[in-house]
Amino acid sequence: MVDSYDDSLDGEKSKTQVKRELHALVDLGERLTTLKADVLAKLPLTDALRKALAEAPKHTANIARKRHILFIGKLMRDQDQEAILVLLDQLDASTRQYNERFHNLERWRDRLIAGDDADLEKFVIEYPDADRQQLRSLIRQAQHEVARNKPPATSRKIFKYIRELDELQRGLR
C-alpha cells in the first residue's frame, strides 16, 4: 500500500512548533517581569500587559505566580515581539559593556596597588586628569592595608576615584 501525501499541511505549523513559540512567549514575558519600571516604559507594550507586569510582584505563591506568568505569555501574543527582543538585546549589550568597563577599572585598581611606577605612568597617560600625588598616596595606603591584612577601605577609595576619572573622561559627569 502506498501512503498518500497531503500538500495542504505544508504551510501550517506543527503542534510542537506552536507549543515552542508559546513557551518562548511565556519565557519572554517572565523576563519582562524582572525589568524595572523605567526600562519597561521604553518598551512598546499594551496597557493590559503593562498592568499585568505591574501586578506580577504581588503574586508570591508558586502556583499563582506560574498562572500569572502564563497570563502574561498570553498577552504577549498581541505584542510586537521583534521590537521587544531588539530593545532587550540593546539593554543586554549596554549591560555587558558596563560590566566590561567596570572590570577594566577593577583591573586598573589591582595593577596600581600591586604594581610599580610604570603602571602609574600608564594610568596617568590614559587618564590625564588624574591627580598623581593623590593617587600615589591612596596606593601607598592600600599597600599598607594589604600588608597588615586590614579591610580594603583605601582600595575602595581608589576604585571610586578611578571610576570618577573614567566618567569624567567619557563625559558622564
Curated annotation (Swiss-Prot):
GO terms for biological process: assembly of large subunit precursor of preribosome. Gene3D superfamilies: PSPTO4464-like domains (1.10.60.30). GO terms for molecular function: ribosome binding; rRNA binding. Keywords: Cytoplasm, Ribosome biogenesis, RNA-binding, rRNA-binding. Belongs to the DarP family. GO terms for cellular component: cytosol. This is Dual-action ribosomal maturation protein DarP. It comes from Pseudomonas syringae pv. tomato (strain ATCC BAA-871 / DC3000). It is found in: Cytoplasm. CDD domains: YjgA-like (cd16331). InterPro entries: DarP (IPR006839), DarP_sf (IPR023153). It holds the Pfam family DarP. SUPFAM superfamilies: PSPTO4464-like.
